[in-house]
Design a protein with these regions (language model features):
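Membrane-interfacial loop-to-helix junctions in multi-pass transporters
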Residues: 1-3, 52-57, 84-100, 129-137, ...
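Long, contiguous bundles of hydrophobic transmembrane helices that form the permeation core
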Residues: 2-5, 9, 26, 32-33, ...
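Interfacial loop-to-helix junctions that mark the boundaries of transmembrane helices
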Residues: 17, 45-56, 169-178, 214-217, ...
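Short helix-coil transition sites and intra-membrane helix breaks within transmembrane domains
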Residues: 19-22, 55-56, 68-77, 106-118, ...
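Core transmembrane alpha-helical segments of multi-pass membrane transporters/permeases
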Residues: 43-77, 249-304, 329
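Hydrophobic alpha-helical transmembrane segments of multi-pass integral membrane proteins
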Residues: 59-62, 89-124, 288-294, 313-350, ...
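Re-entrant/interfacial helical elements at transmembrane boundaries that shape
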Residues: 80-81, 113-126, 155-165, 338-351, ...
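Membrane-core helix-loop-helix motifs of multi-pass transport proteins
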Residues: 125-222, 382-419
Length: 419
């Protein structure tokens, strides 16, 4: 069963590389593996579970709806022209700046998918308008989700590490904050190198700016696209307590209202645009995420993921390698390294003292490695969202982020386990 599953995974990767219809490839692969396992219902149950996942659907369709409102009110053009004119003069700082900006937002908006939806809809068009290749622009935002939520005391992974290490969230962060900051710099620098080698850091011609040469900027309209991000950051940091109650979708709706007030566009047209964008987001972005979950269910049905997790648990003598490689590979394969990180920490890290290892270091290593693996997965929700914003194949993003992810996971292991 394991070998059959691995062969199907390789075929799936090949089909994605050939740019066959992504949703169809993932769905067929997941169903075939489920059939081979003798339980086809796992694929159908995964489909149903995804369709009921309001926590995932809500921010995605709201962000895509808001993006469409920005388009019909032309608020996006005001921001794009305002920033693109300045960004073009930054040269080599364009790409690393986008990576670090996304990481900063991701620290507060800890959902990689939610952060990508909120930031990508705004920042990716700006980068493209400034001359960055679409795939590189999307990769910059995608790479920015490398793991900066590990600096947020309220992040779930922090709570788990604190629990198994019998410590506090603040102690966990104090122990690894320097690692997370170093990884941010490595991610930004490595992607910049890739951009320079491929010649994608400048020179891309975008029609976005062709008709804006004599454009008169309305600064209020230019601020509207940033309003939801400002609300979310001020709320999550506690700067404005009232905003703390707002979800991502709420901030997007407020942004739509602001677009109306700034432009006085017909409310009916804004309403139609919002739901058209929401529908497109569901069909493209969420559709791929749903099919990816069907694929993952097929992988699980053949026992591949459980086998990998069990191998890590059964070999505590190589816990350092297991905590790094296991969650990282599972992040790549499944698009999320959280399951492996949590399983490892609750099964192995809890015995760190017996193994002669530092529980805080081991727990953080597993959590960070899983996040880094996700930034190398073409089926990760945030990869799909960013690719959708740039209208490119998710695999094109991975080709650009892979170098940084691999370097970062090695550096993480060295810093937390050997230095």
């Amino acid at each position: 069963m394991l070998w059959i599953g691995l062969i199907i995974i390789l075929i799936t990767v090949y089909c994605l590389m050939k740019q066959y219809e992504t949703r169809l490839v993932l769905f067929i692969s997941g169903v075939v593996m489920a059939i081979i396992s003798g339980n086809i219902m796992v694929a159908f149950d995964a489909f149903s579970k995804s369709m009921k996942n309001a926590n995932l659907i809500e921010p995605i369709i709201a962000a895509m709806g808001f993006a469409m409102v920005l388009q019909i009110t032309k608020c996006d053009q005001h921001l794009i022209y305002l920033l693109a004119k300045s960004l073009k003069n930054l040269g080599p700082l364009l790409v690393p700046g986008a990576v670090l900006a996304t990481a900063l937002v991701n620290t507060s908006i800890t959902s990689a998918g939610g952060c990508s939806a909120a930031v990508g809809a705004i920042l990716i068009p700006v980068l493209i308008g400034a001359g960055v290749h679409p795939a590189m622009a999307a990769a910059a935002v995608f790479a920015g989700t490398y793991g900066s939520p590990m600096l947020n005391p309220g992040f779930g992974q922090i709570a788990i590490v604190a629990d198994v290490a019998h410590s506090t969230p603040i102690d966990v962060i104090s122990n690894h904050y320097h690692v997370v900051l170093i990884l941010g710099l490595i991610t930004a620098i490595s992607l910049t190198i890739v951009a320079f080698v491929k010649g994608e850091h400048k020179g891309y011609h975008s029609d976005t700016l062709d008709h804006l040469k004599d454009f008169k900027i309305n600064y209020i309209m230019a601020i509207v696209p940033m309003l939801p991000l400002i609300i979310l950051i001020l709320g999550s940091t506690g700067t404005v307590p009232l905003f703390k109650k707002f979800a991502i979708s709420h901030a997007m709706l407020i942004g739509c209202a602001a677009a109306f007030l700034a432009t006085r566009k017909s409310p009916a047209e804004i309403s139609k645009a919002f739901f058209k964008g929401a529908g497109d987001g569901f069909a493209t972005v969420f559709g791929i995420i749903t099919m990816a979950l069907v694929f993952v269910s097929g992988v699980q049905s053949l026992g591949i993921i459980n086998w990998m997790i069990q191998e890590m648990i059964n070999t505590p003598s190589i816990a350092k390698i297991s905590a790094t490689v296991g969650p990282f590979l599972l992040g790549v394969i499944s698009g999320s390294g959280e399951a492996a990180s949590i399983a490892f920490n609750q099964s192995v890290t809890i015995h760190a003292d017996t193994l002669g290892l530092n529980a805080l270091n081991l727990g953080s290593l597993a959590a960070i490695s899983g996040a880094l693996g996700r930034t190398m997965s073409p089926i990760a929700g945030c990869a799909i969202i960013c690719a959708g914003c740039a209208k490119v194949n998710p695999l094109e993003l991975v080709k650009r982020t892979a170098l940084g992810a691999i370097i970062c996971v090695i550096i993480t292991m060295l810093l937390l386990m050997y230095i």
